[in-house]
Amino acid sequence: GKSSGKGGRNAGGVEHNWNEDIPVLARSMVLAKDTIFLAGPPDNTDEEDTFQRIIDRDKTVDAELAEQDAALQGKHGGILLAVDKNTGKQLSSITLQELPTWDGMAAANGKIFITTEKGKVICLE
């Protein structure tokens, strides 16, 4: 069946507390108390709209796809996003100079540690 909204069921029969689009393609994620931290390249593309434009042979979509590819390659750095675990609302975000590695984030003692594709470790407080 269709999702019945907040707290509804999706086709898999799983209860959802919330469902939010976020402006990052999460490569790393960690929960610290009531905050979910996600890090990755920016997500500049609305996939459903883009797919329809490709079907419609809209040539203007090529530039957007090239921009998203550049983001995936790390040309725009990354984003660290903080999200409330209870509501899904974005709390804050910062720009990272480099892309995080896959699953390369940890939280401990009030700090976030992120490893980057260029071999650095970043500590944020």
Features from the language model and the residues they span:
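Extracytoplasmic/lumenal domain signature
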Residues: 1-125
